[in-house]
Amino acid sequence: MEKRKIILDCDPGHDDAIAMMMAAKHPAIDLLGITIVAGNQTLDKTLINGLNVCQKLEINVPVYAGMPQPIMRKQIVADNIHGETGLDGPVFEPLTRQAESTHAVKYIIDTLMASDGDITLVPVGPLSNIAVAMRMQPAILPKIREIVLMGGAYGTGNFTPSAEFNIFADPEAARVVFTSGVPLVMMGLDLTNQTVCTPDVIARMERAGGPAGELFSDIMNFTLKTQFENYGLAGGPVHDATCIGYLINPDGIKTQEMYVEVDVNSGPCYGRTVCDELGVLGKPANTKVGITIDTDWFWGLVEECVRGYIKTH
């Protein structure tokens, strides 16, 4: 099995924590570093959340703080979904784990420049860190093997009728990434909403046990409530974790190649990922867009990762 070298760029975040849990444990993934961006909450909060998850699950991977603001737009957060801390629900021990002193953007640039072009970037929050790295050092572009991101939708948005939160939180950054020429895989809402985590899934992970089973339960029981209140969903989708699933085994997710453009014009479609599903524009595809996911396979994968944290001694 090939180990995919990745940098996970996230804004923890409930589903981000599940993505971290999976990426750090599955043997098909070589998690080099975790970079944190503002998104679901402000950077000071998303950083603490990322460090708390690493400390609880003993994820011994360096964590780097990145962009505290979007490139241009006024900052927004998703406190209606993720709560005041950005990771409401779990109770963590006093935090002793610390972030690295290097800025996340510098870490991304330095790591890619020193690589053989075999590192995949996995941004599952706003694309601010990735876009700034691309603008600061364009020489990283040919060094990026692939970008597998959570964001966007070819159908309806979730933060506006047109836009998904991660893209809407920094559309200009998304525009930089989608015009970069780097191979892109997009897990948008059309796919990720298929991973609604219902009470029976939570019970399954509780039965699996260990610190990851406990954390999964605390996290997803909180989003059960907020997702129903905001969207009428029967549970919280684990949006970000689909990217890790794809990297472990892309056969579990059906994708379609499309030309995708991010709308950065002010107006009702600001932040929309315009996906040319039918090819009517005649432009070459720049993105593999997730369409459907084998949910039985996916939840089995999540459980496998949860069980990986159970200590046998």
UniProtKB/Swiss-Prot annotation:
Q: Which GO terms describe its molecular function?
A: calcium ion binding; purine nucleosidase activity; uridine nucleosidase activity
Q: Which cofactor does it need?
A: Ca(2+)
This chain is encoded by the gene named rihB
Residues bound to substrate are Q227, H239
The name this protein goes by in its record: Pyrimidine-specific ribonucleoside hydrolase RihB
Give the species: Escherichia coli O9:H4 (strain HS)
**One GO BP annotation of this record:** pyrimidine ribonucleoside catabolic process
Cofactor: how bound: Binds 1 Ca(2+) ion per monomer.
Similarity-based family: Belongs to the IUNH family. RihB subfamily.
Which region is the signal sequence? none
- Stated EC number for the protein is 3.2.2.8
The kind of enzyme this is, by top-level EC class, is hydrolase
